Amino acid sequence: MATGPRYKVAFRRRREGKTDYHQRLKLIVSRKPRLVVRRTSSQVIAQILVTRPEGDKVLAAATSAELAKTFGYKGSGKNTSAAYLTGLLIGYKAQEAGVEEAILDMGLRENRAGSRVYAALKGAVDSGLEVPCSEDVFPSDDRIRGEHIAGNTASKYTQYEKNGLKAADLPAHFDEVKGKITSQYGAK
């Protein structure tokens, strides 16, 4: 670590690689709620946050684990389909909480078009949440529905069979779960 009279120690969360304060400041200055999308090794997490002086306040939250518990989703909780459905769910929950618009906060993730973060963003936009974005970054509809998994018969998709779902049936199952979410939240 550098020393000397001119050395300034970075904030702890910056040193730990958890927060980009320049990006966070830009998001906070906008004074809009943030759509925070994070992906872990097993699920996708989406939250609507507002910044307060005492700390961020969560207005709505959704996880891909919630899809399995509430809507009977049998697919993987970390794939593109689950990210889209989680985004759709957070969009509807945000509207119930009175949030009509938000800005995307993807944290320290690399900005890559077609990623799961953008699949969640597409779900939120499809639910009616206003988020400024370009259509070019969204994954294709075939990828969101899981057509790429259904067309692949590789043995790496055995987790689906353990959950009682054949990989070839994922697009139909996706449409079924999307219909359940839309009927529960979208018809209001």
Curated annotation (Swiss-Prot):
Kindly list the GO CC terms recorded for this protein.
cytosolic large ribosomal subunit
Organism domain of life: Archaea
| Molecular function GO terms recorded | 5S rRNA binding; structural constituent of ribosome
InterPro entries assigned: Rbsml_uL18_euk (IPR005485)
Q: Name one Pfam family in it.
A: Ribosomal_L5e
Give all cystine bridges in this chain.
none
Q: Name one GO biological process term.
A: translation
Keyword entries, A-Z: Ribonucleoprotein, Ribosomal protein, RNA-binding, rRNA-binding
CDD domains recorded: Ribosomal_L18_L5e
Q: Which family does it belong to?
A: Belongs to the universal ribosomal protein uL18 family.
The record ties this protein, via HAMAP family, to: Ribosomal_uL18_A (MF_01337_A)
Assembly mode? Part of the 50S ribosomal subunit. Contacts the 5S and 23S rRNAs.
Function, in words: This is one of the proteins that bind and probably mediate the attachment of the 5S RNA into the large ribosomal subunit, where it forms part of the central protuberance.
Protein name, UniProt field? Large ribosomal subunit protein uL18
Q: Which gene encodes it?
A: rpl18
